[in-house]
From Swiss-Prot:
This is Probable cytosolic iron-sulfur protein assembly protein Ciao1. GO terms for cellular component: cytosolic [4Fe-4S] assembly targeting complex. Belongs to the WD repeat CIA1 family. The gene is Ciao1. PROSITE patterns: WD_REPEATS_1, WD_REPEATS_2, WD_REPEATS_REGION. It comes from the Eukaryota.
Length: 337
């Protein structure tokens, strides 16, 4: 087994710590929580992470999620007040320069597309919204997708294409894309296998695979099959299909709330209601179409539910967790020699 070492505990949030988002360069971290604030952390001269800024005037209720744009210039925050705020530092200090309104109640997740020209949000109102970045500080709704039958927990863009995935309380994952002929967004696949709420999803670096985690205490790996694939998987309407190729069961004793697929190492990290963080590695030589994963690390990480886990995009082995206990923790994973 590898080693998960606690590097630092970042304190300051009051109440639950919910979301965490690494800046694309990996040198800045944004976190948010029940205290209606966003904290921006960076390393000081002694390489300790410190809170550089606290943003407290953007939302009137819990902030559930934060995400940096791919260019690193903008930070989006999703709140239970039904809005999404867009922050930037153009003036030298962080300011909220746009507020996206339209959801009927709590916004649970926000995600930027790879190009940075699209933003996705999802809510307890069962809808997924796609927003176009029209011009500076202007965002236009490009689509309202009402395909889920329950609360939508998570949205995540494909790492290379304008394909969007969403996870829901209705136990399914939906995939969406735009019909370029008529600019209409629609769902082209529904991934069904989980037996309870799907809390979170994460694409691998290639975008050909998706990991999901659920209230059913499992993690599932989904593989994309394109039309004309050599595995004989049929693709109706000449559209790629996604199939569950692996289920990780028996590792988690409570709901699995978040999952992060490291784009550099290929390692999976999970955040669980049993207060644990676990690391999984694909077994070398296993078939991508029937992969096997093994647990290569685990840690009792917090004193309450772990809400978020996210690998740093540039520093291999560095990850952040947030918890109901109010703490944000930084960890270093060292594989077994």
């Amino acid at each position: 087994m590898g080693k998960l070492e606690l590097l630092q505990c970042l304190t300051g949030h009051r109440g639950r710590a919910w979301g965490a988002g690494w800046h694309p360069k990996g040198n800045v971290l944004a976190t948010c929580g029940e205290d209606k604030t966003i904290r921006i952390w960076a390393e000081d001269a002694s390489q300790r992470w410190v809170a550089k800024t606290v943003l407290s005037d953007g939302h009137s209720r819990t902030i559930r999620d934060v995400a940096w744009s791919p260019c690193g210039q903008y930070l989006a925050s999703a709140s239970f007040d039904a809005t999404v705020a867009i922050w930037d530092k153009k003036s030298g200090e962080f300011e909220c320069n746009a507020t996206l309104e339209g959801h009927e109640n709590e916004v649970k997740s926000v995600s930027w597309s790879k190009s940075g020209s699209l933003l996705a949000t999802c809510s307890r109102d069962k809808s997924v919204w796609v927003w176009e970045v029209a011009q500076e500080d202007e965002y236009e709704c490009a689509a309202v997708l009402n395909t889920h039958t329950q609360d939508v927990k998570k949205v995540e863009w494909h790492p290379h294409e304008d394909i969007l995935a969403s996870a829901s309380y209705d136990n399914t994952i939906k995939l969406y894309k735009e019909d370029l002929a008529d600019s209409d967004w629609s769902s082209f696949d529904t991934l069904v296998s989980h037996e309870s709420t799907v809390w979170s999803i994460s694409f691998d670096g290639s975008g050909n695979r998706l990991a999901s985690c659920s209230d059913d205490q499992t993690v599932k790996i989904w593989q994309e099959y394109k039309p004309g694939n050599e595995f004989g998987v049929s693709c109706p309407d000449n559209t790629p299909v996604w199939k569950c190729v692996c289920t990780l069961a028996g590792y988690h004793s409570r709901s699995v709330y978040d999952i992060s697929w490291c784009k550099q190492s290929g390692l999976l990290a999970t955040a669980c209601g049993d207060d644990m963080v676990r690391i999984f590695k694909e077994v070398e030589g296993s078939s991508p179409h029937e992969p096997t994963f093994e647990m290569v690390g685990s840690k009792h990480a917090h004193s309450q539910d772990v809400n978020t886990v996210e690998w740093n995009p540039t520093v291999v082995g560095l990850l952040v967790t947030t918890s109901d206990d109010g703490d944000v923790k930084l960890w270093k994973y060292e594989p077994e020699e």
